[in-house]
């Protein structure tokens, strides 16, 4: 199984909506500098989606002489751009923000008083699943239920094989809670299709 996290999904959308002729003129590297070789005959772009404090970014960004290796730095949020700017003094004239987005807006489910409240959490387990499960233990309303699609498989089989075991305890805890339904990994398309059936998306932060 190949990774299909946010980076891969957005790259798919880029290839879907931008002409091949234009894309062939660029060399796009996502997040980790050097993951894709610099092409001297193309416009080299670093599409940065990771947080500024990731260890595998420090060697490149702390060396200001290397900042000229890319023609453009694209960030997925103003918050992320500002973090990189403050931390590494990157050349602002080479930076642009293109926000994350979606291409489908499902019809929103209208909640009716008295009906069960369905919550969904579909993030990787290190993004607050432990906090969320602790919160669910404090909820004694039988009409509030949480479906958990959390897994490491979104980043591919190799990553999952090396990482999933670290979170088995959390998954088991989710399975034991009466108001939580642990489902595990489902493809992006499935999550999009199911989203209108839920009342809230919960992201503990």
Name every feature range the model reports, one short phrase each.
Residues 160-189:
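Nucleotide-activated donor-binding/catalytic signature segment of Leloir-type glycosyltransferases, i.e.
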Residues 2-3, 152-167:
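Short, flexible/disordered intra-domain loops and linkers
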Residues 26-56, 71-75, 96-99:
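Active-site proximal beta-strand in glycosyltransferases
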Residues 71-85, 90-107:
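Donor nucleotide-sugar binding/catalytic pocket of nucleotide-sugar-dependent glycosyltransferases
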Residues 196-205:
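Acidic donor-binding loop of glycosyltransferase active sites
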Residues 52-73, 167-174:
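Membrane-proximal helix-turn-helix segments that form the acceptor-binding/catalytic region
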Residues 111-128, 133-138, 147:
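Conserved donor-binding/catalytic core segment of Leloir-type glycosyltransferases
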Residues 1-38:
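N-terminal pre-catalytic "stem/leader" segment of glycosyltransferase-like enzymes
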């Amino acid at each position: 199984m190949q990774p299909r996290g946010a980076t891969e999904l957005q790259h798919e959308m880029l290839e879907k909506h931008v002409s091949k002729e234009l894309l062939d003129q660029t060399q796009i590297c996502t997040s980790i500098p050097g993951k894709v070789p610099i092409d001297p005959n193309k416009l080299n772009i670093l599409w940065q989606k990771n947080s500024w404090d990731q260890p595998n970014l420090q060697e490149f960004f702390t060396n200001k002489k290397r900042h000229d290796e890319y023609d453009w730095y694209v960030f997925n949020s103003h918050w992320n751009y500002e973090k990189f700017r403050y931390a590494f003094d990157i050349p602002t004239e080479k930076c642009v923000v293109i926000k994350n987005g979606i291409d489908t807006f499902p019809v929103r489910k209208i909640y009716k008083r008295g009906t069960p409240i369905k919550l969904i959490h579909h993030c990787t387990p290190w993004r607050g699943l432990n906090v969320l499960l602790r919160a669910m233990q404090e909820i004694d309303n039988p009409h509030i239920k949480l479906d958990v699609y959390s897994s490491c498989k979104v980043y591919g089989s190799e990553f999952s094989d090396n990482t999933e075991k670290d979170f088995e305890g959390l998954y088991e805890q989710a399975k034991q809670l009466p108001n939580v339904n642990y489902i595990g990994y489902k493809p992006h398309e499935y999550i999009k299709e199911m989203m209108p059936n839920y009342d809230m998306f919960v992201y503990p932060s």
